[in-house]
């Protein structure tokens, strides 16, 4: 059995009407836990930290959409694991950066890497998220991509640059 806690602004009456038991509020949850895996939308995690985590002594791991400043360490489980030990707040790299660093870090440990050039061709939106409106076009972001900058933050000895191309699809990524 799992307990369900509601975030601020959730309609508790709707849960009650559907006979879904609610254990409490998000603040009440924060009083009960030692660590929070915060995957809320970008910007909400830092608000949760200020409003709840610091108040109740809750350690937190934030998803890639948050600003790096939310955490003690910008964290990747392979490339800088040791830096995250005994820290209160970690911010994870984005999904693309996570995969990229896994590859670069493994190659770096085996043969040494000084420079990387990255190309990411990715969907413009997640499945079910169609609000971006890109149709029959490719959109290229300015170099270097945040993935290249993030890689250099985690692995400062590697010089990285990269381009990112958004495609008008909702499935799939190509990282080279």
Which positions does each model-derived feature cover?
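Active-site-lining helix/loop region of Rossmann-like oxidoreductase modules
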Residues: 104-176
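N-terminal Rossmann-like NAD(P) cofactor-binding subdomain of oxidoreductases
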Residues: 1-125
